[in-house]
A protein has these predicted regions:
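Mixed-charge, glycine-accented linear interaction segment located at domain edges/termini
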Residues: 36-40, 50-57, 116-143
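Short aromatic-glycine-(Arg/Gly/Cys) micro-motifs in beta-strand/loop hairpins
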Residues: 20-36, 106-122
């Protein structure tokens, strides 16, 4: 759903998604955030989601309302204090060859994400209630 408000750059989990190529409907590109000078590269949409979810887990924001079950005994990871190394303005300067999206996941409830995504080239902000809705937004805008 198209909204009229914009994403705050100053949320701890602000992510800039730069889409560099689209091959057979598969998106690939880079992810930028304030806690790393180097981008994280993804080759497909699943990697994009895994990298982002791992980032939210390390940041512990937004906190997930459910934990994934596993049959493998997990070691409890200690809380890692992340330090900002880039300003939000620096993160926002990066652009993708095919498209750029600012992502703000506000909640992680019902084993999914809820939040807003801003398509920079189209100057449109969308609200999404699930990862599936987010993927549909990215797909409809780019493919």
């Amino acid at each position: 759903m198209e909204q009229s408000y914009h994403i705050s750059w100053y949320t701890p989990n602000f992510i800039n998604i730069c889409i560099d190529s689209i091959n057979d409907g598969e998106l690939s590109g880079r992810i930028y955030h304030c806690y790393s000078k180097e981008p994280r590269r993804f080759a497909n949409i699943l990697q994009l989601l895994e990298i982002s979810d791992d980032f939210f887990n390390k940041l512990q924001f937004p906190q997930a309302s459910t934990n994934a079950r596993t049959f493998i005994l997990n070691q409890t990871s200690e809380s890692i204090e992340l330090t900002k190394v880039l300003s939000p303005e620096k993160v926002a300067e990066n652009r993708g060859e095919k498209g750029t999206f600012f992502l703000n996941v506000q909640y992680r409830q019902n084993s999914s994400w809820q939040g807003i995504v801003n398509w920079i080239e189209g100057n449109i902000t969308y609200h999404f209630l699930s990862v599936l809705e987010l993927l549909k937004i990215l797909s409809n805008v780019l493919v």
